[in-house]
Design a protein with these regions (language model features):
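N-terminal helix-loop segment corresponding to the beta1-alpha1 unit
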Residues: 15-190
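Single conserved hydrophobic/aromatic residue that forms the stacking wall/gate
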Residues: 1-13
């Protein structure tokens, strides 16, 4: 049983989610871990309907990140609040039909796969803009879509080190120190 205050909070939160400034937008979320889910969480918080697409059996890597509450990752739940979710294998023709139906109604697609992955499945920028010309296509990758490092995976700590940020944190005469939060992912997610 919820207290009066808890009921008021639920009503307030539901109102905010339903009537935010992005309430008429549909976002397709093909993201995982932090940068993409953070971006789409903000869009959801602002009222957009967000449908998160996850690979069968694997899902978002962050489902395995602790701490856990009743077997669910608190990290995953916090970044994916307010979103709908469906499991689709984008290599499977039946699942592609479902995905295409979702895309046909969508306003925005957000993805953070390694460059070239969606192209292999027929959903790269060139394919999408021909089939869905009004769709906004947002892509985040650690080292960009072009250039010599595009194939490398990027985690925030690696980018902090490569960018020199770790050399100016921590104590004098100590090892390079990671900033306490994943500042690169969070900033890019904005």
């Amino acid at each position: 049983v919820l207290s009066r205050r808890q009921r008021q909070m639920c009503i307030r939160d539901r109102y905010i989610l339903m009537d935010g400034p992005l309430k008429n937008l549909l976002v397709v979320d093909l993201t995982r871990v932090l940068v993409g889910p953070y971006c789409t969480m903000i869009l959801s918080d602002l009222g957009a309907r967000v449908i998160k697409i996850e690979a069968p059996e694997i899902g978002d890597d962050s489902r395995k990140f602790g701490p856990f509450i009743k077997d669910y990752s608190a990290y995953f739940m916090s970044l994916n609040r307010g979103k709908e979710s469906i499991s689709l294998n984008l290599k499977n023709s039946d699942d592609k039909k479902i995905f295409d139906k979702i895309l046909s109604k969508a306003d925005i697609l957000v993805e953070n796969f390694k460059p070239g992955t969606l192209e292999k499945w027929g959903y790269g920028w060139k394919d999408i803009c021909k089939k869905y010309p009004k769709l906004i296509y947002a892509s985040a990758s650690g080292f960009g879509q072009t250039g010599p490092l595009k194939e490398l995976p990027a985690y925030d700590m690696v980018v902090q080190g490569m960018g020199g940020l770790m050399s100016v944190t921590g104590q004098p005469n100590s090892e390079p120190t990671r900033v306490g939060t994943s500042i690169g992912d969070i900033t890019a997610g904005l």
